[in-house]
Amino acid sequence: RENKIDLTFNCIPNPKDNFRRTPIFKDNVLVAVPTSYPINNTLKNYALTARDIMFRRNLMPDCPAIPSLAPFADVPFILLTKGNNLYSRSVALFEDAKIDPIVRLQVSQLVTAYHLVCSGLGAAFISDWMVLYDHDDMRYYKIAHPLAVRQFDVVSSSRNYLSKPQKAFIESISSYYHPYL
C-alpha cells in the first residue's frame, strides 16, 4: 500500500487489488502425518511416501486424493497461526469437512510445523515443495479440494516502474519455475 517493498511473493486466490502480479509456480498442500499414527492404516490406499512426493507422483492424475478431511477428525493437528494463508485454507478445509479439528499446537513457520510432524507431535498441512529427502517419518495425503492448490505470484506495485534488475529477476524465476505453473 505504501510502496515500500519492490517485490514480494503472494498466493492469495483471486486477488482484488491493483498490484502487478506475475504467476510463478503452484504448490500443492498435503496433509503430513507421522508414520506411527493409526489413521495411516485406515487411509493406506491414499498414503504417499516422501519418495512419491519427491518424484511428483502427487501431481499425476491417477494419484488417489482424500475426498475430505473427515477421516482426520480424531487426529491432532499442528496449525499455522492466524494471518497465514495456509491457516485460512486449513480452517476452510476443516469447515468443508464439517469437523472441529484437534489443535495440538500453533506455530508461525511452516518449516517448524513440518519438523514437529517428523517428531511425531501431530499432523500438519504442508507444501509438497518441502519434501526434499527420502525418509520414513511420515505419510502424505493429497487433498481433493481446490484450496489444496496454491498459485504463487511475484507481486509489485502497478504504480511503480519495474527496474531492469527486477525484470531480470522475474524472468529468471519465471523460467526456472515454468514447468511448475
Language-model-derived ranges and their functions:
Residues R1-D52, C118-L121, M138-Y141:
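Short beta-strand-centered segments that line the small-molecule binding cleft or hinge
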Residues K16-D27, V111-R159:
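Beta-alpha-beta core module
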Residues A32, I78-L80, V155:
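Short hydrophobic segments within beta-strands
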Residues P38, R139-L181:
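A late-sequence structural motif
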Residues C11, I39-N41, Y46-A97, S163-Q166, ...:
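Secondary-structure junction motif
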Residues R1, R21, I66-L69, A113-Y114:
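Short hydrophobic/charged patches on amphipathic alpha-helices used for structural packing
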